[in-house]
Curated annotation (Swiss-Prot):
GO terms for biological process: wobble position cytosine ribose methylation; wobble position uridine ribose methylation. It comes from Saccharophagus degradans (strain 2-40 / ATCC 43961 / DSM 17024). This is tRNA (cytidine(34)-2'-O)-methyltransferase. PANTHER family: TRNA (CYTIDINE(34)-2'-O)-METHYLTRANSFERASE. Homodimer.
């Protein structure tokens, strides 16, 4: 399936919701530290997570450790700075979808590393500032899975 990457996430319920999305879709979740919470935070548990859902979660000490450990072939960043809509590209099996922290988004050095050709945005009304992280991750995962014909779903 796909890999969801949360760079320095800050809000536990968002991460909890994304863990559930990963469990429901077969995605693997990568959390890049520092995190704005502890992984045993009860607010993560409020998302109704079962023990088995945690099997898809991997933590990395920082961005460089993530790149070294995963050696991702293709990264897609989600940002309000994106020049392409999320549905205008072909997302493939094993691709990595990278999201920034809730209050500040991805830093410029990561957007540059990924390259701006792979920085996507989700359409919003002009006066909207940003989407909730867990909502944006859900939109992206289901669009990517749709492109694969919802392979493996029931």
């Amino acid at each position: 399936m796909f890999n969801i990457v949360l760079f320095e996430p800050e809000i536990p319920p968002n991460t909890g919701n994304i863990i559930r999305v990963c469990a429901n879709t077969g995605c693997r979740l990568h959390l890049i530290e520092p995190l704005g919470f502890e992984l045993d935070d009860k607010r993560l548990r409020r998302a109704g997570l079962d023990y088995g859902e945690w099997q898809s979660v991997v933590t990395h000490a920082n961005w460089d450790a993530f790149i070294k450990q995963q050696a991702p072939e293709r990264l897609w960043a989600l940002s309000t700075k994106g020049t392409k809509f999320h549905h205008e590209v072909s997302i493939g099996e094993g691709d990595y979808l990278v999201f920034g922290p809730e209050t500040r988004g991805l830093p410029m050095e990561i957007l540059e590393y990924i390259t701006f050709d792979n920085v996507l945005r989700i359409p919003m009304l002009p006066n909207s500032r940003s989407m909730n992280l867990s909502n944006a991750a859900s939109v992206m995962v289901y669009e990517a899975w749709r492109q694969l014909g919802f392979a493996g779903s029931k």
